[in-house]
Amino acid sequence: METMASPGKDNYRMKSYKNNALNPEEMRRRREEEGIQLRKQKREQQLFKRRNVELINEEAAMFDSLLMDSYVSSTTGESVITREMVEMLFSDDSDLQLATTQKFRKLLSKEPSPPIDEVINTPRVVDRFVEFLKRNENCTLQFEAAWALTNIASGTSQQTKIVIEAGAVPIFIELLNSDFEDVQEQAVWALGNIAGDSSVCRDYVLNCSILNPLLTLLTKSTRLTMTRNAVWALSNLCRGKNPPPEFAKVSPCLPVLSRLLFSSDSDLLADACWALSYLSDGPNEKIQAVIDSGVCRRLVELLMHNDYKVASPALRAVGNIVTGDDIQTQVILNCSALPCLLHLLSSPKESIRKEACWTISNITAGNRAQIQAVIDANIFPVLIEILQKAEFRTRKEAAWAITNATSGGTPEQIRYLVSLGCIKPLCDLLTVMDSKIVQVALNGLENILRLGEQEGKRSGSGVNPYCGLIEEAYGLDKIEFLQSHENQEIYQKAFDLIEHYFGVEDDDSSLAPQVDETQQQFIFQQPEAPMEGFQL
């Protein structure tokens, strides 16, 4: 697991936290396996590649109908690309070149399955389109060739590779300075598709020095569609974790993104927030650069945006920033983030609720004042309700938030969580299949029991007030059951809790694990009945 905080913070936490079972690196969590899962999903709010599909007007309809007849007939074995089309493409007549390039472009714009492979497998056709990109005296030909190449690059990685190998990228970057906005916009679109293909393609485009001309375009353009496409391309240049882009090559975009966050256009805002979420996903140095660009207050404001596609990436960016150290987390808190996060916990979208819980869990991994701020914002009652009733993926994040608070909180703060009823939902998590969450719940209960032991000693009664609450929630039965868990850390923790907090005079020797000296591991009696009660 990645290191979440600076060494100084690590040392401080290890000394100050009463519970060392969850180390600081674990408590402050970047997206791990769920981040990977999210990246693999086709997100409705953001496409990494886009095809330019023409809106057909009546004048072009007859020609397009004939073209489609030709395309449909190709499914019977005839080629959609005739020898005549290829000859016209290589003609010296610029009118024929334009007409034929337009034909190719229309074919490549057809839904749902454009004949990309047939086009790229026709010798020298892609190279010819790249040649046409250089024809500064004929901007219409440049535009049509750029459009055709854009749609080829919207395909598979292999199809995108053909466009790169034909030498299109440096020329597209030059065209960002074209005098013709249509050509500029189509070049941006093509570069966005290429950068969105893979980290290798993204880095190649960055190494071709795209950033300065792209930022210049963004600064000067007054055309909304151009700005939208440019911000989308920029977000693709910032995207990716394995590996991430070289930060020095993308960080110069931060001042421009800071300005774009004040746009009134939802599409533009969404891509600007996604770009910031990618830039803030990493070590604290990256987080600091994002903070220094002055975006935090506006990102927090955008948490309340009425369009889900804006609020979601804004929340991701805010969540990434609070994976930083306590000072970085405090910047977000100082922007009045907690009332916004409380509001998002009631979102109709489960993914937003889950992400809000994850963000809060990283705040409760902070210092005691930050835990108190979460208490003062009345967030914990909602978290405990989520812990009881939500989908499992959201309950997991709420469990982290509560256990983190029991790890770093004061006795008074822990008592407050107990008074809200956190014990029963933590006990309920002891029967889930996810071993990590079972450990998180056990650690939360251990922190509560440790406080109860201190209170029993102080009162002179010697009675731990929280043992009874755990027994009432059937927690003791579940902890006993975990002594036969396959995970060594879980069964050892369960055994230790039973022995330390629920021990009886006549110890039942059958509960104690035996030690296999040869394997250096514990051996447990197999339960007679199969383990039940597991939930997904």
Swiss-Prot record:
Keyword hit for Acetylation: yes
Record-annotated IBB domain positions: 1-60
Gene3D superfamilies, alphabetized: Importin-alpha, importin-beta-binding domain, Leucine-rich Repeat Variant
PROSITE patterns tied to this protein: ARM_REPEAT, IBB
Source organism superkingdom: Eukaryota
Residues modified to Phosphoserine: S6, S113
Region (NLS binding site (minor)): 316-404
The keyword Transport belongs to this UniProt entry's keyword annotation: yes
PANTHER family, sorted: IMPORTIN ALPHA
Family membership noted in the UniProt record: Belongs to the importin alpha family.
Subunit composition and interactions: Interacts with ZIC3. Forms a complex with importin subunit beta-1.
UniProt protein name: Importin subunit alpha-7
Species, as recorded: Homo sapiens
Taxonomic path: Eukaryota, Metazoa, Chordata, Craniata, Vertebrata
